[in-house]
Amino acid sequence: MVVTTSARGGGGDRTPSRRRGCGLAPAGAAALLAGASCLCYGRSLQGEFVHDDVWAIVNNPDVRPGAPLRWGIFTNDFWGKGMAENTSHKSYRPLCVLTFKLNIFLTGMNPFYFHAVNIILHCLVTLVLMYTCDKTVFKNRGLAFVTALLFAVHPIHTEAVAGIVGRADVLACLLFLLAFLSYNRSLDQGCVGGSFPSTVSPFFLLLSLFLGTCAMLVKETGITVFGVCLVYDLFSLSNKQDKSSNGALCPRSPQQPGSPQPSSLPGHPHRENGKQQRFPHKGAWGGCHSPLPPEPKSSGFPVSPRAVWSMMRFLTYSYLLAFNVWLLLAPVTLCYDWQVGSIPLVETIWDMRNLATIFLAVVMALLSLHCLAAFKRLEHKEVLVGLLFLVFPFIPASNLFFRVGFVVAERVLYMPSMGYCILFVHGLSKLCTWLNRCGATTLIVSTVLLLLLFSWKTVKQNEIWLSRESLFRSGVQTLPHNAKVHYNYANFLKDQGRNKEAIYHYRTALKLYPRHASALNNLGTLTRDTAEAKMYYQRALQLHPQHNRALFNLGNLLKSQEKKEEAITLLKDSIKYGPEFADAYSSLASLLAEQERFKEAEEIYQTGIKNCPDSSDLHNNYGVFLVDTGLPEKAVAHYQQAIKLSPSHHVAMVNLGRLYRSLGENSMAEEWYKRALQVAHKAEILSPLGALYYNTGRYEEALQIYQEAAALQPSQRELRLALAQVLAVMGQTKEAEKMTNHIVSEETGCLECYRLLSAIYSKQENHDKALDAIDKALQLKPKDPKVISELFFTKGNQLREQNLLDKAFESYRVAVQLNPDQAQAWMNMGGIQHIKGKYVSARAYYERALQLVPDSKLLKENLAKLDRLEKRLQEVREKDQT
């Protein structure tokens, strides 16, 4: 800790000494600052994409991998939506988006490198701030170093640095400072009398304009650097001359302590919240408890409710100024989201919190008056610059002049905190001047302890930002009365399958904010009782009639209840109010396809792909539709597009594999199945690959695949049944029998188990048991006539093996009655009649079978045998007649 002090003496108020030397070389100071920044934020390198990062990077069509570099970046907002769209956040930050794109181009979607860039930028801002304070504020390297050190470790910066989307604030701040320094460099710092400072370096002036424009394109509030430069000019207009000891006026060197202090006014960042569209609130007022009161039904009130509401809003917003200052002074309670009940409304002038507002107003007024008085005496420019740095960047976020989409946002304090740090260090320096040596030492030790405490708090805050779970859980712990944090944590728990916990937090959110339509909607999705779920969806729609997800969920619920026309209406409304909601297109098109309204379904899919071109699920579902409607070649392109949009879309890969399998391209099918397994080693991917191996006679590979699948999902009956079937084909009938009987013991109504047991017993030549298994299957009374036909056909085969030809014939006859296309049964009936010497009926059965399978060689051979027999019989008859 290096603080310059001067001895007390007569003559009243003294300023701190302006000595340049502080015992610390610039390189050493820079190294210490960079080291402190890295130590505080190094933990964030292990973090993942959390909160707004998901919407700004992972789900942003302008940023995510595979998305081409297009001009849309300069026409879309920070989240990838067109600036002209009603749903756009109107946050225009194309250069920040380009840095995300560059990150992905160089290092992929690894969050480590995103966090590394943020830390590097924070280090650079800290170093440039030290340089700015050294050259234009304190003109004292020691004080500049302490200011930058306080800035480097302040916990309020955690959201801006540890949260990847905070790069907009950090990078804009860096460009802001560089633009201001360039502008300062372009001015004539010499004596200019009563005129504006003249420009001596057009290059630095143009550079300042360029850097300021870049700051604006990184984050909108970067434009305020131009206003800062104008204010700097205004304060540079007067007092450019200093009185010498003999009263003469002389030009003042830029390095003189009394020179006017340029003020760097970083632009105020506009907080973005990627989840705002999933949570209804009215701008900044959304963080307060009370909704807008209704208009009075009578005019008997002495004071208009509108006037009362305006007063409440003014008092609350004024208090929020004091609250933000308190976060800078004592960053004890920090949270990623301060909306929906975090800060109750200041409803009356008697609210004790108004004292904080009044105190802040008095302090700011006194400081301003002090600045004006000191400015005329060419003293205490640090206070002036500190106030400008603190106040100007925060004006856009104050809600006093226009509304912004948040109540309190920690990352918007990144730039204003520079002013706080300057004022803090200046005050520390003044106190050291006034105190004796013992008091000054105590103050310095206390400041060191404060810096250590801030550093510890910053490290702990970084741990909170490591994952979605830790971030959302911390919100619930920090602000348990905030409905939004309960809602966000419930969403995370829902995604993790922890439904009971999710339901609890959704209900807590509703207790705190009963008008939370999205919480009602999500609660409905977790409710098993359809009547209760329907009630939640309807309540959500009462609160928000255009809630497209509630319309979607209610439509799907009615679809499951066979109320298809009502479902279609709701799904169409969901699309109407959420034209970029891809799931609604898929659900509506699927419902229309079920009703064989294929043309309408096709139109819905086409419209959906037009409005949601980046939806991989929509392309995949359209591919399924095309396969079902007999257009497999066209489906290939959409499956491939789904995979292109989402390289980890294993469902599309499996569907593409199945399609190639149906087209007979087994090698391509196998390739896509294996690619899907590289993405996700799941049983539902192993199963079709095992079926491919089984159906192509590669039984050893099929056995291995099914064993892996059964190990992943040992409770899934179909996988164990398929494994038993492979074992039976490979001759391991005992093991297959044991496995199948075990499944039957768990589920006595397993029809396929009895069919497989029949095949196993038949392979063991135990036809009695095989016949018994088929009879048990028939006792289950399956509803599908084709399945019953197959069972009677199998029963006929077992009876035929036992030489019970009449009973076998009867079973075959029942089989063809249920399924006249059962060619094998017709042929077997012909064979029985053939054996029994009933050649005429045998021929009739053979010919019926041949109509179904005209290329059957076996049938043709049997008919040829029958022809020869009939010819011999004819010859015998002719001989007998002669």
From Swiss-Prot:
Keywords, alphabetical: Endoplasmic reticulum, Glycoprotein, Membrane, Repeat, TPR repeat, Transferase, Transmembrane, Transmembrane helix
Catalytic activity: a di-trans,poly-cis-dolichyl beta-D-mannosyl phosphate + L-seryl-[protein] = 3-O-(alpha-D-mannosyl)-L-seryl-[protein] + a di-trans,poly-cis-dolichyl phosphate + H(+); a di-trans,poly-cis-dolichyl beta-D-mannosyl phosphate + L-threonyl-[protein] = 3-O-(alpha-D-mannosyl)-L-threonyl-[protein] + a di-trans,poly-cis-dolichyl phosphate + H(+)
Cytoplasmic side: 1-20, 132-137, 182-197, 239-313, 376-381, 425-438
Top-level taxon of origin: Eukaryota
EC main group: transferase
Positions annotated as TPR repeat: 483-516, 517-547, 548-581, 582-615, 616-649, 650-682, 683-716, 751-784, 789-822, 823-856
Enzyme Commission number(s) from the entry: 2.4.1.109
InterPro entries: HAT, TMTC_DUF1736, TMTC_O-mannosyl-trnsfr, TPR-like_helical_dom_sf, TPR_2, TPR_rpt
TM regions (residue ranges): 21-41, 111-131, 138-157, 161-181, 198-218, 222-238, 314-334, 355-375, 382-402, 404-424, 439-459
One Gene Ontology term, aspect cellular component: membrane
Low complexity composition bias: residue spans: 251-267
Short name of any one Pfam family annotated for the protein: TMTC_DUF1736
Glycosylation positions in this chain: 86
Compartments where found: Membrane; Endoplasmic reticulum
UniProt record, GO biological process: protein O-linked mannosylation; RNA processing
Pathway membership: Protein modification; protein glycosylation
Gene Ontology molecular functions: dolichyl-phosphate-mannose-protein mannosyltransferase activity; mannosyltransferase activity
Positions of region (Disordered): 1-20, 246-277
Membrane topology annotation: Multi-pass membrane protein
Ranges in the topological domain labelled Extracellular: 42-110, 158-160, 219-221, 335-354, 403, 460-882
Reported function: Transfers mannosyl residues to the hydroxyl group of serine or threonine residues. The 4 members of the TMTC family are O-mannosyl-transferases dedicated primarily to the cadherin superfamily, each member seems to have a distinct role in decorating the cadherin domains with O-linked mannose glycans at specific regions. Also acts as O-mannosyl-transferase on other proteins such as PDIA3.
Assembly and oligomerization: May interact with FAM168B.
Family (UniProt): Belongs to the TMTC family.
Name recorded for this polypeptide: Protein O-mannosyl-transferase TMTC1
Species assigned in the record: Homo sapiens
